[in-house]
């Protein structure tokens, strides 16, 4: 019996050390050397203080800022510890009511009849940092008015912040809301 148990225990300990310790430490070390910013969460600093990550959405309020997608992560949204969608199906009355209410409020706030889908639907993670370029352009009149910026100049800033498809063919062009708002803060002083 001991003759059969020993190889099993050696295998368990060996694989635990290899897959639970050596492999993760090796990959972390390689990532730190090759992609240090990415390996540490793609953090964004302002005046020496970490204010967010390129990879995790944040809630922005007020007319001076572009708004991201709504978040279902956590009680008040944008809670990275509670990442996840609302789990409401497309025919769920609560989801339909929320989308209609959000669409109505956005139509009144933005002065436009129909808001883009990005502004009324959550992402699967609830923490999507990106919106479509169309969604950013939809918000230009409100942000331009609040900041006292010419709409054409603001559209140009948005154009500069559009990130192309990954590898030229994966996904759709997107705008990172945090990075766009930081560019606005640097260029606008009103």
From Swiss-Prot:
Write down the Pfam families for this protein, in alphabetical order: KdpC
- Main subcellular location: membrane
**Membrane topology classification:** Single-pass membrane protein
Membrane-traversing stretches: 10-30
Provide the Gene Ontology terms for cellular component. Answer: plasma membrane
As one GO molecular function, the record gives: P-type potassium transmembrane transporter activity
- Localization in the cell: Cell inner membrane
Sorted keywords for this record are:
ATP-binding, Cell inner membrane, Cell membrane, Ion transport, Membrane, Nucleotide-binding, Potassium, Potassium transport, Transmembrane, Transmembrane helix, Transport
What the entry lists under InterPro entries is as follows: KdpC
Provide the family line: Belongs to the KdpC family.
Quaternary state and interactors? The system is composed of three essential subunits: KdpA, KdpB and KdpC.
Q: What does this protein do?
A: Part of the high-affinity ATP-driven potassium transport (or Kdp) system, which catalyzes the hydrolysis of ATP coupled with the electrogenic transport of potassium into the cytoplasm. This subunit acts as a catalytic chaperone that increases the ATP-binding affinity of the ATP-hydrolyzing subunit KdpB by the formation of a transient KdpB/KdpC/ATP ternary complex.
What name does UniProt use for this protein? Answer: Potassium-transporting ATPase KdpC subunit
Organism per entry? Brucella anthropi (strain ATCC 49188 / DSM 6882 / CCUG 24695 / JCM 21032 / LMG 3331 / NBRC 15819 / NCTC 12168 / Alc 37) (Ochrobactrum anthropi)
């Amino acid at each position: 019996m001991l003759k059969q148990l020993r190889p099993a225990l050696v295998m368990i300990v060996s694989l635990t050390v290899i897959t639970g310790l050596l492999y993760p430490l090796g990959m972390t070390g390689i990532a730190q050397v090759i992609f240090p910013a990415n390996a540490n969460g793609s953090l964004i600093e302002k005046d020496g203080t970490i204010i967010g990550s390129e990879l995790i959405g944040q809630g922005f309020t007020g007319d001076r800022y572009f708004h991201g997608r709504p978040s279902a992560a956590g009680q008040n949204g944008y809670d990275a510890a509670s990442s996840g969608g609302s789990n409401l199906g497309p025919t769920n009355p609560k989801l339909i009511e929320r989308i209609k209410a959000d669409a109505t409020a956005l139509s009144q706030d933005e002065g436009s009849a129909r808001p883009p889908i990005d502004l009324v639907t959550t992402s699967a993670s609830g923490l999507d940092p990106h919106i479509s370029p169309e969604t950013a352009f939809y918000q230009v009149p409100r942000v331009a008015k609040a900041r006292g910026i010419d709409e054409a100049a603001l559209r140009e800033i948005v154009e500069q912040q559009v990130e192309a498809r990954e590898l030229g063919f994966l996904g759709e062009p997107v705008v990172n809301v945090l990075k766009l708002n930081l560019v606005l803060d640097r260029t606008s002083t009103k």
